[in-house]
Swiss-Prot record:
SUPFAM superfamilies: Sigma3 and sigma4 domains of RNA polymerase sigma factors. Might take part in the signal recognition particle (SRP) pathway. This is inferred from the conservation of its genetic proximity to ftsY/ffh. May be a regulatory protein. The lineage of its organism: Bacteria, Bacillati, Mycoplasmatota, Mycoplasmoidales, Mycoplasmoidaceae. This is UPF0122 protein UU142. Coiled coil: none annotated. It comes from Ureaplasma parvum serovar 3 (strain ATCC 700970). It comes from the Bacteria. InterPro entries: RNA_pol_sigma_r3/r4-like (IPR013324), UPF0122 (IPR007394), WH-like_DNA-bd_sf (IPR036388).
Amino acid sequence: MLNKNKRWYLIALYDIYQGLLTTKQCEYFNLHYFKDLSFSEIAELKEISKSAISDCLNKVCDQLLKYEQALLIYEKNKKRNDLYTLINDSELVKKLKDI
């Protein structure tokens, strides 16, 4: 079981990189992380083995981490948002976020 921080981190990465995953990978990720179904429940629903679900979701998580390691989109967004908190001009922050 993932701790909450890693779970939310993977969900954030999924929001960024889901377009790089297959339809099946997205479906299993959604069922597990957003619908909160267990591997067993997904396996029963999709009529495949629990280990196939586990393998697929482990691969998805590995892929998401590799994409972030290479592209750093999440990290750059986080740094940018941290910098926004240092700016006292709310209009400027709004304009920067709109870019």
